[in-house]
Amino acid sequence: MNAYKGKITFNKEQCVLCQTCAFVCPAGAINISCVEPQKSYDFIIWHNTCTVCGNCTYFCPTGAIALSNTLAEATPQSEKYTSITANMVEYGECANCHEPMINVPLTMLKRGFKTISEPITSLFKLCPKCRRDHTFAKRAL
């Protein structure tokens, strides 16, 4: 099977809003902007601006961005911003205090832990403050 660099795909469930993809994109084809603080962000990819360099895919820590095998079509410069992928990445909420937080996808946990157990997944459903409090409370002093 011949694989080639194609159109960028985006999985908003995997995105942790680190904005690395936008930072490493030499063409400026990725824009992440706040819609409502602590609630949601717009994630936009301008396909006609993309040079298909693959930097976003390579540096994305969760695999939220991938290059597909669907060949992108060439379009005139006047249509530069017309072919887009737009998604809204929404914050989740802490299972304990219900404060807004960025969800930690399973792919990210698999990169950090050898095995994923229920205590680990439940711990990462907590915001950083509640996670610290929970971990500190479990320590024997």
Predicted regions: what they are:
Residues 1-39, 71-107, 123-124, 130-141:
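Ferredoxin-type iron-sulfur electron-transfer modules and their immediate structural context
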Residues 10-11, 45-48:
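Long, contiguous interaction/targeting segments characteristic
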Residues 19, 53-54:
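Short tyrosine-centred short linear motifs in exposed loops/low-complexity segments
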Residues 47-50, 116-134:
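Cysteine-rich micro-motifs
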Residues 59-74:
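Short, structured interface segments
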Residues 30-31, 56, 65-66:
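Short hydrophobic beta-strand motif reused across regulatory alpha/beta modules
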